[in-house]
A protein has these predicted regions:
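Hydrophobic residues on the short alpha-helix immediately C-terminal to a glycine-rich phosphate/catalytic loop
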Residues: 1-2, 25, 29, 81, ...
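A short secondary-structure junction motif
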Residues: 2, 52-59, 108, 112, ...
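Alpha-helix C-capping/helix-to-loop hinge sites
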Residues: 32, 36, 59, 81-88, ...
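Post-Walker A helix-loop "phosphate-sensing" segment adjacent to the P-loop in P-loop NTPases
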Residues: 1-10
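Conserved helicase NTPase motor core
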Residues: 13-15, 21-24, 41, 67-74, ...
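Coupling/switch/interface segments within P-loop NTPase motor domains and analogous charged loops
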Residues: 72-144
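Short alpha-helix boundary/capping elements
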Residues: 22, 49, 108-113, 181
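Conserved P-loop NTPase-based nucleic-acid remodeling module centered on helicase motor cores
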Residues: 9-103, 224-227
């Protein structure tokens, strides 16, 4: 319908959450319209984020050739960062492991909640962990910046930051993405919802979701975003 109304494929942004959903979405679009899927801006939030950051990320100090860390590599970098700052922390039997800390940090970033609040929630109010874990998170972020690497959460967080801090980029997105279509919206978190809101200042958004299929609450997914 949008194509029939004269909207160019390259001005339609198609977003979804998982790689599987993205493949299915783009295949359906190509089958229904006869237009090659590559003519649209389409894919997961993370895929679109990395495309935009490689092209427009300079104001945030991001080089086009930055490397994306998979989950294992990101956890290893965090572990090495912790070891450099406080080797005894990881040796203590009762302290949370690097993988656990990575989950706390990721959850805070995706939900846009203060890391301190997440730490207290996960440790039943133990404030002893607040200062060191926040220090580890800051050092981890600096290590990524210095090495020009990004974890999956960076692809969203930096995209949002760029929309907020770079008016030229925000205007480009609003002009380029005249129509925004989001599938599997029940799996989006607050960070992704903020991205959609900042892109679609024209309010031309169609979102599809099913609350019974919301399975990523452990990563901050909120079906309420659709309202």
């Amino acid at each position: 319908w949008l194509l029939d109304q004269g909207v160019e494929p390259g001005r339609i942004l198609l977003l979804t959450f998982t790689n599987k959903a993205a493949r299915e979405m783009l295949a359906r679009v190509e089958s229904l319209t006869g237009v090659p899927a590559t003519a649209f801006w389409g894919g997961t939030f993370h895929h679109i984020g990395q495309r935009l950051l490689r092209r427009f990320g300079a104001p945030l100090g991001i080089e086009p050739g930055f490397t994306i860390l998979d989950q294992g590599d990101a956890e290893l970098l965090l572990q090495n960062t912790i070891r450099r700052l406080d080797a005894d922390f990881l040796k203590a039997k009762d302290n949370p492991k690097a993988k656990t800390l990575a989950n706390w940090i990721s959850y805070a970033r995706n939900t846009r909640e203060p890391l301190e609040d997440i730490i207290l929630e996960r440790t039943m109010g133990n404030r002893d962990y607040v200062e060191p874990v926040c220090e580890f998170a800051d050092a981890y972020r600096e290590a990524k910046r210095r090495q020009q690497v990004a974890d999956y959460d960076d692809l969203l967080e930096l995209w949002r930051d760029l929309l907020e801090k770079d008016a030229t980029f925000a205007e480009w997105c609003a002009d380029r993405f005249q129509e925004v279509l989001v599938d599997e919206y029940q799996d989006t978190n607050r960070l992704q919802s903020e991205i959609v809101d900042r892109i679609a200042t024209h309010h031309r958004v169609m979102a599809v979701g099913d609350d019974s299929q919301c399975i990523y609450t452990w990563r901050g997914a909120e079906f309420g975003n659709i309202t």
